[in-house]
Amino acid sequence: MAKRQLNRRQNWRIEKIQNERAARAAKREQHALQELEGGDLGPEQLGLVIAHFGVQVEVEAQDGEFAGQVFRCHLRANLPALVTGDRVVWRAGNQGIGVIVAQMPRSTELCRPNNHGQLKPVAANVDLIVIVFAPAPEPHPNLIDRYLVAAEHAGIRPLLLLNKADLINDENGPALHALLEVYRDLGYPLLEVSAHHGDGMQRLQQMLDGHISVFVGQSGVGKSSLVNSLLPAADTRVGDLSEWSGQGTHTTTTARLYHFPNGGDLIDSPGIREFGLGHVSRDDVEDGFIEFRDLFGTCRFRDCKHDREPGCALLEALEDGRIKQQRMNSYRSIIASLPEDSY
């Protein structure tokens, strides 16, 4: 059945109701915060945001008498938006409730535009972004390259992870191996695992230890299954592939940080089908294609669009095999998707 289209008045009414609900929730939160701060609060101490629930977050105490304990915390109104992975200064209150009073500087942040095109951080202080894909749903090089550009732009080291390796067969194997070979030749770290059978999981754990990692990738590639295999106590819900669309059903609804036994953390974030890059410039995209970097600026024409122009360094590199057609297609697609003012 086709989805019913709403008229302008209906959309306005829905937005009005949502804004009113948000205002009431904010008012209740402010009242609770005032009551909390009116009582006895403990000293300032360091904490780590391990989950975010709208107007409240879960904070794990990093020092002091409460080290290792988790508190549900209110946010002071003057704080910037916090995300999982943020380091904060907080004060403990009564009944396991606390107040966050300051945000510590971030070493990195992973951002994506929201539905309104506004830039929104989704994880903080991450130093390893694990790009997960699988034989099914069919991996899209363009999406993988978007994640790689985002990782390069954020200064976060990427790891390409092929999950469900047990599903590789004679039919999909040649295309998958050709896909992997492109990234292997570029020097990107790459690992094949099966969360279901356990193949390669010990090696994955070793590569994650000592890092703050985040798993990204389209729904249905097994991110939740990977978390359950690495951390059985996490009990992340798993969704099956939709039989109708072949795409994954979204399962994880809240970004949460988990600790590995041997050190390091993992942030499990909601599944993303399309990762927007509207917040990056053309220069950022060009820098994100690592094998293209030395070629930009060497074309015959300064305003070369790398399409059909004579003397184009990218086209010459494409012709002699120094860059792959797959990557060239992704580059053109990503550049075409940027807002005009990004040029």
Curated annotation (Swiss-Prot):
Principal subcellular localisation of the protein: cytoplasm
InterPro entries: G_CP_dom, NA-bd_OB-fold, P-loop_NTPase, Ribosome_biogen_GTPase_RsgA, RsgA_GTPase_dom
Residues that coordinate or bind Zn(2+): 299, 304, 306, 312
GO MF entry, a single one: rRNA binding
Cofactor(s) needed: Zn(2+)
Subunit note: Monomer. Associates with 30S ribosomal subunit, binds 16S rRNA.
Cofactor note: Binds 1 zinc ion per subunit.
UniProt-listed Enzyme Commission number(s): 3.6.1.-
Function: One of several proteins that assist in the late maturation steps of the functional core of the 30S ribosomal subunit. Helps release RbfA from mature subunits. May play a role in the assembly of ribosomal proteins into the subunit. Circularly permuted GTPase that catalyzes slow GTP hydrolysis, GTPase activity is stimulated by the 30S ribosomal subunit.
This protein's name: Small ribosomal subunit biogenesis GTPase RsgA
Annotated source species: Pseudomonas putida (strain W619)
Key words of the record: Cytoplasm, GTP-binding, Hydrolase, Metal-binding, Nucleotide-binding, Ribosome biogenesis, RNA-binding, rRNA-binding, Zinc
Domain CP-type G: from-to ranges: 116-275
GO cellular component: cytoplasm
Binding site for GTP: 163-166, 217-225
Presence of keyword Transport: no
Enzyme class name: hydrolase
Family: Belongs to the TRAFAC class YlqF/YawG GTPase family. RsgA subfamily.
UniProt xrefs under PANTHER family: SMALL RIBOSOMAL SUBUNIT BIOGENESIS GTPASE RSGA (PTHR32120), SMALL RIBOSOMAL SUBUNIT BIOGENESIS GTPASE RSGA 1, MITOCHONDRIAL-RELATED (PTHR32120:SF11)
Gene that encodes the chain: rsgA
Compartments, as annotated in UniProt: Cytoplasm
GO process annotations (BP): ribosomal small subunit biogenesis
